[in-house]
Amino acid sequence: MRDLLAMRTYFSERKIDFVDWKIENGEDAIDIRKAINPDIVFYTQPYHGVYHHKHCFLNFTDRLLCYYPYAFLQIQDKYIYDQVYNNIAWKIYLANDYSRDDARMLARNKGRNVVVVGYPSSDLYQNVKLPEAWKDDNHSRKRLIWAPHFTVA
């Protein structure tokens, strides 16, 4: 709720138009069709229960639906690539060729709607020349690999 209020303040102070979802205090959620009647609808989390039922993607199947995942996809699983949304969306924007290939292999529509666009929060690491942290010709430093989420067997 604090974030919602902060966003309202930010946009209002700068006189930037925005659509207020008005979801607090038991208010009925805004009817997107009546308020802005969009031609294209973007989702970052097209899952049931994330949005108000009025904003579910199933209510907009007559519009161009787009999906840009909220998180970096790392799991090769039908659950990630073969939901109803994945198969009916007009465009699915994925971070890399690996994710595109997973969609081609796992989705019923064979990933025909996938476009590889990169992942903005990690794009800054592309083509960056970093110093060679592991190079130590004199073997003067010990190295420790800290990987608490992985098992080395």
Task: Give residue spans per PLM region.
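Conserved catalytic-core segment of nucleotide-activated headgroup transferases in glycan assembly
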Residues: P120-A153
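Active-site and donor-binding regions of nucleotide-sugar-utilizing enzymes
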Residues: M1-Q126
